Regions:
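Short glycine/proline- and acidic residue-enriched helix-loop micro-motifs
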Residues: 36-45, 182
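A structural signal for short, well-ordered beta-strand elements
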Residues: 47, 213, 257-260
Length: 269
């Protein structure tokens, strides 16, 4: 369809750690005691050996496409899961995206400790692999620019702006918490655009990748004009289908022709 690379669905820290505990002889009850919030998720998605399934996905993907295949790990702290990064590399992943999602709801937690944990997680992963590692950030930091610089100094080859927490909702008839909208809205693109512009103007020494709320070829053009090296799309493909990538590329090429650009580099901000 014309994509330049594929980022696979994230494998979650809880999936990896629970699989390791199974191998070490822990019971299901022990695992759920350790990860109570993940019980429903694990019951639904743990079919066979989750790590092996993910590695198989990498290998099979490499066989059918000639573009980079990027593995993704969703994590919130350092743990046993880190050693699995090497296995994903060995399975053929061309790069790794760390989708770090630390929920800061503890009022006693020093905000600086959160940023230090991001750096620490990245460094531990970097020790185990030699493929490029990018970090996917949230937008709720006091100083995103400083964190971005510190992550690049710690070895990040790319920064992805931004990740997205699953949003809760409440069913007022059943008076229960339910899952909210799981895909991004086009309006979310504007915040990404702001921060891509700000960080690119500061010459962050790594690639900047725009994510969240990118729905059209026009959205992609805006992000590149702002300074993004790459642009990620997901929600629009759920809504419009994988083949929509062709339309987005066609729209970008038509715009480039109108403005006499021969290469994407010619109009990157």
């Amino acid at each position: 369809a014309g994509a330049g690379a594929v980022i696979l669905k994230s494998i979650f820290e809880e999936q990896i750690s629970s699989e390791i505990k199974r191998e070490e002889g822990y019971s299901e009850e022990d695992i759920y005691d350790a990860y109570p919030e993940a019980q429903e998720y694990l019951n639904t998605f743990m079919r066979g050996t989750e790590i092996e399934i993910y590695e198989k996905l990498i290998r099979e993907s490499k066989k059918v496409v000639d573009i980079p295949i990027i593995a993704s790990i969703n994590c919130s702290d350092k743990g046993e899961w880190i050693r699995i990064a090497k296995e994903l590399q060995d399975a053929g992943a061309d790069a790794l995206e760390l989708n770090i999602a630390i929920a800061a709801f503890d009022r006693d937690l020093d905000p600086r400790k959160i940023e230090e944990e991001y750096i620490s997680i990245l460094k531990e992963v970097e020790k185990n692999i030699n493929i490029p590692v990018s970090v996917k950030l949230g937008d709720h930091f006091t100083n995103i620019s400083r964190l971005a610089f510190n992550l690049t100094k710690a070895g990040a080859k790319g920064l992805v702006l931004f990740n997205r927490f699953y949003n809760p909702d409440i069913n007022i008839e059943k008076m229960k918490v339910v899952t909210g909208n799981s895909i991004s809205a086009p309006e979310e693109n504007h915040n990404t655009l702001r921060w891509i512009s700000l960080l690119s103007s500061q010459e962050i020494p790594c690639e900047l990748s725009a994510s969240r709320g990118v729905y059209t070829g026009e959205d992609v053009i805006k992000q590149i004009l702002a300074g993004a090296q790459t642009v990620q799309v997901c929600s629009t493909l759920y809504r419009n289908g994988i083949e929509y990538v062709k339309q987005m590329n066609a729209d970008i090429e038509a715009w480039m022709d109108r403005h006499n650009f021969d290469n994407v580099k010619d109009f990157r901000g």
